[in-house]
Design a protein with these regions (language model features):
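Acidic (Asp/Glu-rich) sequence patches and key acidic residues
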Residues: 2-113
């Protein structure tokens, strides 16, 4: 899946079936995000990811993850080069190893992530 949107972003919702697990492990989730090789910045509950090798044109971030809700993680994708896909894949695999998740687009359709 190749997404290269100049002024738009794709939004995906990462939802944990067990919302109690999600709420109880938010700090652990945040630490996992901060340990990704593409992590660059945290602003409150907003986490910026960037693949510096592949996306020199994007000034600040390629993906933002928002953890301000108790029901889901909002993933806003502006650009996702291979290095970023690997980083997100690692994070999603870790989540799936700890709880059951579903990933949907903004229309509620299942995502292939």
């Amino acid at each position: 899946m190749e997404v290269n949107l100049k002024n738009m972003a794709a939004e995906l919702y990462i939802k944990c079936i067990d919302t109690n697990w999600f709420r109880n492990n938010k700090n652990l989730i945040e630490e996992k995000i901060k340990n990704l090789k593409t992590f660059v910045l945290q602003k409150n509950n907003e986490f910026w990811l960037k693949d510096y090798e592949a996306s020199k044109d994007n000034k600040y971030f390629d993906v933002r993850l928002f953890l301000d809700k108790d029901e889901f993680i909002l993933m806003e994708i502006t650009f996702h080069p291979k290095g970023l896909e690997e980083s997100l894949g690692f994070f999603l695999k870790w989540l799936r190893n700890n709880t059951t998740i579903i990933i949907e687009d903004e229309d509620g359709e299942p995502s292939s992530w």
